[in-house]
């Protein structure tokens, strides 16, 4: 991919991520690499000067392999279900998984069903459950990321930390440890308008998370099969096409549309991943 083509790709990724669950108008079809090298290929700043930033809200563009880290109106704002990336991060830090492992399991009780009913009544993204259903960590993390299951976020909080408040405290501790100084989490799902961050903080978190094979595998799935809910689908725009390999979208009335997108490409023969984040769309 040449400079002009990659510049067009970058502009398209930013524009496409702003659509949030609509079609992504990428101008270049690329295949995801299997390995992202640690070496950095230098790229001129002109690469991103023509990027089409959104008309409102905020945005970030991060390409670790090229040393590109650009932002637009990088203000603190509610992030909706993008919050669940940190929910996954804390879970996988406290209860590490390898691909194919199930991790610890729990049995859904009446509280779990009532939580689902309450979330459904308030139009929060959630996954149907039933009393007696057995769900393991790998299923809960996958449901959290694929179908943005807010009730699974609550279950993970209980599984990992014993309670939602204790888990949220871990989220904020880890955010600070990662250098996310403009981020604060108020809940595990992002339904709270007090869960806030910047586009740049979330771009860097996404890049860190994509190094985890379980996370990367989960966010690449377009569907997931669960015992009671059956087959649920992803909300990530054009996942599996045009090089899109993840990661997470979200929307609330207060936050607007939010999207974190990862697109795999090549530049001068080197595999790269373009991370684009938009908030407040």
Name what the model sees in each region:
Residues 93-112, 213-221:
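Short, well-structured active-site flanking segments
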Residues 63-65, 83, 110-112, 131-133, ...:
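A mature extracytoplasmic/lumenal domain signature
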Residues 113-153, 231-247, 251:
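Conserved catalytic neighborhood of penicillin-recognizing serine enzymes
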């Amino acid at each position: 991919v040449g400079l002009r083509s990659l510049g067009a790709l970058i502009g398209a990724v930013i524009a496409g991520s702003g659509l949030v669950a609509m079609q992504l108008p990428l101008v270049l079809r690329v295949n995801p690499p299997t390995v992202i090298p640690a070496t950095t290929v230098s790229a001129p700043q002109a690469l991103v000067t023509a990027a089409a930033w959104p008309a409102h809200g905020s945005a970030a563009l991060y390409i670790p392999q090229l040393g590109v880290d650009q932002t637009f109106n990088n203000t603190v704002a509610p992030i909706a279900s993008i919050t669940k990336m940190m929910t996954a991060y804390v879970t996988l830090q406290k209860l590490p998984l390898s691909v194919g492992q199930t991790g610890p399991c729990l049995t859904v009780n009446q509280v779990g069903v009532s939580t689902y009913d309450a979330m459904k009544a308030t139009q929060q993204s959630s996954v149907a459950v039933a009393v007696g259903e057995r769900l393991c960590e790998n299923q809960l993390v996958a449901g959290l990321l694929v179908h943005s299951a807010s009730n699974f976020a609550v279950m993970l909080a209980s599984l990992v930390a014993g309670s939602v408040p204790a888990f949220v405290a871990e989220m904020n501790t880890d955010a600070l440890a990662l250098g996310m100084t403009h981020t604060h989490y108020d809940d595990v799902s992002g339904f709270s308008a007090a869960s806030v961050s910047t586009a740049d903080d979330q771009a860097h978190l996404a890049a860190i998370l994509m190094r985890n094979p379980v996370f990367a595998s989960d966010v690449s799935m377009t569907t997931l099969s669960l015992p009671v809910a059956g087959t649920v689908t992803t909300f990530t725009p054009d996942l599996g096409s045009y090089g899109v390999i993840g990661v997470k979208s979200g929307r609330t009335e207060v936050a607007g549309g939010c999207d974190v997108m990862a697109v795999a490409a090549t530049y001068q023969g080197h595999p790269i991943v373009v991370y684009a984040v938009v908030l407040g769309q």
